[in-house]
Amino acid sequence: MTTMNFYDDLVMQTQMNYSRHYPIYASGGTPYQLTDKKPLPYSEQIDRLVQEIKEADCVVVGGASGLSAAGGGDFYYEDNDSYRKYFRPFAEKYHFKGDFAGMGHPWKTREEYWGYLATFLHTTQTAPVRHPYLNLDALLKGKDFFILTTNQDTQFVKLYPEAKVAEIQGDHRFFQCAACCTDDTWDAVKPVADMVAAMGDGTKIPTDLIPRCPHCGGEAFPWVRGYGNFLQGKKYEEQYEKISRYVLEHKDSKILFLELGVGRMTPMFIQEPFWNLTLSFPHARYIAINNKYDFLPKQLEDKGMTIVADIAQVLRDARDTMENGDNNQ
């Protein structure tokens, strides 16, 4: 097995498991036997989280959608204040129940389709770093760490060099050819800003601003999985190479796998590989923070912990605990 495909192979293995047990996952469950140990009181969980971070030689953070949602990036699945703030013209015209509802809408024109898509991309490209990310950053201060994320919203790369972040589901800052005629990706930030500026308070962009592939002339598309023909070329392989190299270089260290906000749609990218690695590596530890799911495999009950609470609150409390402890030393 090469370094490049080590983590990719883990993902493929868990994808096969996901397919075999899809009804269980679709109902919000997991096919794995879970621990029946009673969880620690919340305050003790926070203390343990802080202690595990301090004692770890290195930390691998797995950041998923729940992390961004906890910081206000919660406009994907419901018509809430956040959605109205960014998508008001579309919300009032079409009454979508969140961003993803609009993504699946049968748009009558490409100009309006791109008006909606550009609005979405602009919200993430220009968003400030959200508080949960800042509190996580404070917890990682002075640590050797690496970030693995399925989020495409650019939050992590606003904080850290790209060498420390693996974006295995893509990145809203880049376009690709929708037909994958080329392995190239290119800047999406300026074209998106131009589309949003030209649209004003409307819902359509000018035809000549529809982004196109510089090679074949066909339409471009955001370099992200989930909305189209995701390009799994050189840039994609580089993401898996980064996480694979880091994990293999630290497999004998006291490594903490810290999972944040993984749901039931994509447990195969972060959660289950983290479980496998924690079980396999002799000094590995695992902590998951989730506002809904309490999934700790029985095989990991002595090497891990789940904290079922609001992610933003947990990271804020952990930061306060760590900083207060440091001040009292």
Predicted regions: what they are:
Residues 2-329:
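Conserved catalytic alpha/beta core of Sir2/sirtuin-type deacylases, generalized to analogous enzyme cores
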